[in-house]
Structures are given as C-alpha cells and as structure tokens.
C-alpha cells in the first residue's frame, strides 16, 4: 500500500516548501523506502516552459523533455533520481485533460464540475505515479487560501478519506516571525494558517515552523496547543547556512521518525552517512575561488539555480569554496570587461534574445584572450562560436540569426526542424539526447567515455556550413550529437588552460555526490589558475 505525504504552505510563499519536500523524500529514501516527489503548481500554464525567469526562477529540464518548476531540480538532486514530466502537475494540464474528455463525450452528458471531475483527475495523476513507490511526497505549490490551490487541497482531503488516514499524512510549512521590538517569536500567523487549512477539512499531522532562530520552547507549546498537533511534531526549521543541511536538521528534530510512525511503517535507521560527509566537507572548506557568471537574469539568481548548485557540487569534489561574482551582461556593454578583473573563472550561461548578447561576447573574448578558465552553456556556447568567428576568423558582423536575421555570416542558425513552427510551448529540442565525444580531447578527459546523455533546451545550432573553417582555425568540436553528426554539441580550445562550451545544459544532471564533469573541470582549473597567480605575486 503506497503512503502519501502532502506538504502545504502557509503565511507567506518562498518559505522553502520545495527544500522541505525534497528533504522529507530523502529521509524516507534513507530508510530504504522507495520514494518519489511530485510538485503541484496551481498556475494555469501547462508547463514552466514559456514563463519569465524573473517571475519564476529557472526552468528545469527533465530527461523526457519536460520543462518544469525548479523544485523538481531540488528533488532530483536530493534523491539522486530522474523524474518525468508527469511528476509536475499543473492546473493547465488538469483542465486540458478534463476538457478533452468532455469533448470526447466521456462524461456522458454530465455537468462537468470542479468536484468531482477536476478533483478526480488530480487524484488520478497522483495515483498513476504512486503505483511504483512505497512513499510519495506531494508538494502543493502556493499558500493555503490561494484561490488557485483550492481544487488540489480538496483532492488531497478526499485522498485521505479514500486511502485511509493511516496512509495519508499532512505536513504544513509555516513562518514564525520574530518582532525585533518585542524580541519574541510570534505564533499567531501559524495559528491562523492552520485554522484556514482546517476549514478546508485538513488537519495537519506535523508543522514545520520556519524561523530565523531555533523555535523557542514557549512558541512550540503554543503552536501545538492551538493547532492540535503533538509537540513532537512541531518541527523547528531555522535558517541554516546551506540547503543541504536541511534534511539533517529535520532528522535531528525527529520529523522522519514521526512521519514513519504516523504512517504505520517500520522505523528503520536512516542511512545518511554519505550526505553527512558531503555537508561536513562543504562546511569545512577554507580556500576559495571566484567565478563570474555573466547573464541577463542575474537580478534574480534563482534563474541560475542549477548552475549555483553544480558549482557547489564541484566545490566539494575540488575541496575549494566557490564565490560567485554575479555580473549583468549589459553592464559589461556599458562599463567594459574591467568588471571581470581578478576572477578565477567565467561562466556564460543560457538565455534567449538580444539583450546582453554583446556583453556576453565581450566576456567570452576576455576569457579567451586572457586565458581565464571558461565554460559556456547553451546560448553561451553559440555566442562562443560568434566571438571566434568575428575575432579569430575576421568575419565582421558574424552572429546568430536569432539576434540578427540579416547577418552576413550566420554562424549560428535555426535548426531545420524548427523553421515552420507556430507554437512556442514545448517545441524546442528538449530533454536528454546522446552526445558522442571524441577521444583525446578535454571533453573525453572530463567524461571518461565516448557517449553521454545530456539535457537540451534550444532552437538554434552551429551552422554546419562553417564548421570546417572553425576547425581549420583551431577550434575543436569535441562532442557531436549522437542522432545527427552535423549538430555540434561541445567545443574547446586545446591551447588554453580550460576553455570549453556545451550546447546542452550540464547543470541539470549535476548531483551533490556526482558533480557534472564540465563544472568539476572548471572549478579545478580555476583553483590551479588562482594558485599560479598567487605564486607569481
């Protein structure tokens, strides 16, 4: 019998429900239970693919090409697993299916309503995934009281009724503010939030109280009394230095043990040794390197969440802390490359459109000419080709046709299969594709194999007509698409310390104990470069 743990949020959004859900998943998996995580996003978009990163943070891409909420990235990293597009349930998907069924006449003339038709479809989607697992953690996005999340909370309430109380638990994440004026933690927002949840027919089994400092005993007692939750199940989730500490904190607070007991499961000793080792290693790092990320969404660093995490993973494997210098690409256009002075490594990440493109090209030139360890990703890969064409091959005005359709040298062009599309949603080259790696190259040294699967999200590619000219000038295409030999995937400059760019997004497959090879290589090169600089000064 599958067990379900629903995670809801109250008071304010952005409390870390995603990290809490991922941590619960990890604590169950560490006990030997086959566990997975589902994210419910109550917005009406079908998926996260066409959303602005400023509003929503990064769009995370799965193996099957699903463009999903960044929380699924956290689930994959914490549980070291690969999820599917079905693990992200949105209002858009649910309504689409119900309307299609209604058009096909599957409801036999019934009046189609939120209850039972929408709620049944939500439950069907959750159960569909649950079939292969012992425990399913379901995070319901948004805040209790939001009009959008009502049908999902109702479906969760019904599931507890249908599956039996012993098979469904509710964890409510709330915020306990501390008012500086009075210097005490305030539990009233939590009380009201739980009251709201109970008015919808849901009694939480555990409360994860987010606060800056550990929860005071008085506050814990008060929350327990007013929310009808046992004291042992009022969990203090105070701020920690790093999100990877959260599972260990929740375990120390007794959440794993409590949930297993609440669901009538055998409480096995959780095996968190590897995780503890990784966290201890990360916290103990003394030396640091500084890596610049030059992008167009740096005002909201969550737009590059997986890159931040991949650098963290690589910092553990290289035993050196990575400090990130965030630089707006347009600032480079305005103030020049002096903004990059002193960095030990440079990343130009993905991103669409003309804004900041010239700043990124200036950055790539600076990295190449000054031999600074460099990694270009997706659009960063394409602009590396543009920079090389302009400044090494002398192709004045070379560009990507995405930015300049009239360029005399279209060194980056729309992929042939992308030419006549009228829809933007879900139509790119998305998901995991095979990449063949040439032996004797930096890429082969990093991956140590000649065939890898990496995740993609792009419409443009290196124009095959120019490949020969690039190669003659010393640019090495060390990775090509396994499904189309004319499609370039990895480029490198062998005469540089570390200069590599990928058409795919290596950050999406990076894991705490298995850093993405190109990130590991970048941090290693940055560390060596810094040591060289320090030795000469």
UniProtKB/Swiss-Prot annotation:
Residues annotated as binding Mg(2+): 71, 139
Active site: 378, 505, 507
Pfam families registered for this protein in UniProt: CTP_synth_N, GATase
Residues annotated for ATP binding in this entry: 14-19, 71
Record-listed E.C. numbers: 6.3.4.2
Pathway: Pyrimidine metabolism; CTP biosynthesis via de novo pathway; CTP from UDP: step 2/2
Region annotation Amidoligase domain: where it falls in the sequence: 1-265
Binding residues annotated for CTP, in chain numbering: 13, 146-148, 186-191, 222
Gene Ontology biological-process annotations: 'de novo' CTP biosynthetic process; pyrimidine nucleobase biosynthetic process
Domain called Glutamine amidotransferase type-1: residue spans: 290-532
Residues that, per the record, bind L-glutamine: 54, 351, 379-382, 402, 459
Residues given in the record as UTP binding sites: 13, 186-191, 222
Top-level taxon of the source organism: Archaea
Catalyses which reaction(s): UTP + L-glutamine + ATP + H2O = CTP + L-glutamate + ADP + phosphate + 2 H(+); L-glutamine + H2O = L-glutamate + NH4(+); UTP + NH4(+) + ATP = CTP + ADP + phosphate + 2 H(+)
Regulation: Allosterically activated by GTP, when glutamine is the substrate; GTP has no effect on the reaction when ammonia is the substrate. The allosteric effector GTP functions by stabilizing the protein conformation that binds the tetrahedral intermediate(s) formed during glutamine hydrolysis. Inhibited by the product CTP, via allosteric rather than competitive inhibition.
UniProt keyword terms in alphabetical order: ATP-binding, Glutamine amidotransferase, Ligase, Magnesium, Metal-binding, Nucleotide-binding, Pyrimidine biosynthesis
GO MF term set: ATP binding; CTP synthase activity; glutaminase activity; identical protein binding; metal ion binding
NCBIfam families: PRK05380.1 (NF003792), PyrG (TIGR00337)
Any further remark recorded for this protein: CTPSs have evolved a hybrid strategy for distinguishing between UTP and CTP. The overlapping regions of the product feedback inhibitory and substrate sites recognize a common feature in both compounds, the triphosphate moiety. To differentiate isosteric substrate and product pyrimidine rings, an additional pocket far from the expected kinase/ligase catalytic site, specifically recognizes the cytosine and ribose portions of the product inhibitor.
PANTHER family in alphabetical order: CTP SYNTHASE, CTP SYNTHASE-RELATED
Job of this protein: Catalyzes the ATP-dependent amination of UTP to CTP with either L-glutamine or ammonia as the source of nitrogen. Regulates intracellular CTP levels through interactions with the four ribonucleotide triphosphates.
Similarity-based family: Belongs to the CTP synthase family.
This protein's name: CTP synthase
Organism field: Pyrococcus abyssi (strain GE5 / Orsay)
Gene: pyrG
């Amino acid at each position: 019998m599958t067990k379900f743990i629903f995670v809801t949020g109250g008071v304010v959004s952005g409390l870390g429900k995603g990290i809490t859900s991922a941590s619960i998943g990890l604590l169950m998996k560490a006990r030997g239970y086959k566990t997975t995580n589902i994210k419910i996003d109550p917005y009406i978009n079908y998926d996260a693919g066409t959303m602005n990163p400023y509003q929503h943070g990064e769009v995370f891409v799965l193996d099957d090409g699903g463009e999903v909420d960044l929380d699924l990235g956290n689930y994959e990293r914490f549980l070291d697993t690969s999820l599917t597009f079905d693990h992200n349930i949105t209002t858009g998907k649910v309504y689409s299916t119900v309307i299609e069924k209604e058009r096909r006449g599957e409801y036999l003339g019934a009046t189609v309503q939120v209850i039972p038709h929408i709620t049944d479809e939500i439950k069907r989607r959750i159960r569909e995934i649950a079939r292969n697992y012992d425990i399913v953690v379901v995070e319901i996005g948004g805040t209790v009281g939001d009009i959008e999340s009502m049908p999902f909370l109702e479906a969760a309430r019904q599931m507890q009724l249908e599956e039996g109380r012993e098979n469904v638990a509710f964890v409510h994440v709330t915020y306990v503010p501390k008012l500086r004026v009075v210097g005490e933690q305030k539990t009233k927002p939590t009380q009201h939030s739980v009251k709201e949840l109970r008015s919808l027919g849901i009694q939480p089994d555990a409360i994860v109280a987010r606060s800056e400092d550990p929860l005071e005993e008085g506050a814990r007692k008060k929350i327990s009394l007013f929310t009808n939750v046992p004291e042992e199940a009022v969990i203090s989730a105070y701020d920690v230095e790093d999100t990877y500490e959260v599972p260990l904190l929740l375990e120390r607070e007794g959440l794993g043990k409590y949930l297993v007991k609440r669901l009538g499961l055998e409480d096995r000793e959780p095996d968190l040794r590897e995780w503890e080792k990784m966290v201890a290693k990360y916290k103990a790092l003394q030396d640091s390197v500084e890596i610049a990320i030059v992008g167009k969404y740096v005002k909201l660093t969550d737009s590059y969440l997986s890159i931040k995490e991949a650098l963290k993973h690589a910092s553990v494997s290289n035993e050196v802390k990575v400090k990130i210098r965030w630089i707006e690409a347009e600032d480079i256009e305005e103030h020049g490359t002096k903004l990059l002075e002193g960095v030990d490594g440079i990343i130009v990440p993905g991103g669409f459109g003309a804004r900041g493109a010239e700043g990124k090209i200036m950055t790539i030139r600076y990295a190449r000419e000054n031999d600074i360890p460099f990694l270009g990703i997706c659009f960063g890969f394409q602009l590396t080709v543009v920079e090389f064409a302009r400044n090494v091959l002398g192709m004045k005005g070379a560009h990507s046709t995405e930015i300049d359709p009239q360029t005399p040298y279209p060194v980056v062009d729309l992929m042939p299969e992308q030419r006549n599309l009228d829809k933007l949603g879900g139509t790119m080259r998305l998901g995991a594709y095979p990449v063949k790696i040439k032996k004797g190259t930096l890429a082969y040294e990093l991956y140590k194999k000649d065939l890898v699967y990496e995740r993609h999200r792009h419409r443009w590619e290196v124009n095959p007509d120019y490949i020969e000219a690039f190669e003659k000038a010393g640019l090495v295409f060390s990775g090509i698409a396994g499904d189309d030999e004319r499609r370039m995937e990895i480029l490198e400059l062998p005469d540089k310390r570390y200069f590599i760019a990928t058409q795919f997004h290596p950050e999406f497959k990076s894991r705490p104990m298995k850093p993405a090879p190109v990130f590991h290589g970048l941090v290693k090169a940055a560390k060596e470069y810094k040591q060289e600089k320090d030795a000469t000064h």
